Amino acid sequence: MTGSDISHILKEGELEKRSDNLLQFWKRKTCVLTTDSLNIYTDQQKKNKSKELKLQSIKKVDCVEHTGKFVYFTIVTTDNKEIDFRCSDEKNCWNAVIAIALVNFQNRKAIQGFKTQKESENTSLGQQERCMARAP
């Protein structure tokens, strides 16, 4: 990914996050999912960002459970940290949108890596051809 890539907002709204402390209370957070991160705010005005989860640091969206009132899911990071979330109804749930954003991000990253590899190979071949042309 390059610095010139622009992050577009994919979803915005409220999500509940389980706290990391011993009591593990559910706290309502304002969240913004972009093409490269999930931003979690402590306030609805989005002035106080409490956490930014870059999609490159997310391994998977896991443990989806539907109850009568909530849909629960877990985001697993690349360092195997688990962050639990829940949303109030299936129609407004985030797990599928986050999973699709993650797949799209990984695809863009793979394509960029492939292009970089091909450019490197082409540069290397061009240098070899120039050396061969100069040889007696």
UniProtKB/Swiss-Prot annotation:
Keywords: Cytoplasm, Membrane. PROSITE patterns: PH_DOMAIN. The keyword Lipid biosynthesis does not apply. Residues 9-103 form the PH domain. The gene is phlda2. The PH domain binds phosphoinositides with a broad specificity. It may compete with the PH domain of some other proteins, thereby interfering with their binding to phosphatidylinositol 4,5-bisphosphate (PIP2) and phosphatidylinositol 3,4,5-trisphosphate (PIP3). GO terms for molecular function: phosphatidylinositol phosphate binding. This is Pleckstrin homology-like domain family A member 2. Signal peptide: none annotated. Plays a role in regulating placenta growth. May act via its PH domain that competes with other PH domain-containing proteins, thereby preventing their binding to membrane lipids. It comes from the Eukaryota. It is found in: Cytoplasm; Membrane. Its main location: cytoplasm. SMART domains: PH (SM00233). It is a peripheral membrane protein. One of its GO terms (cellular component) is cytoplasm.
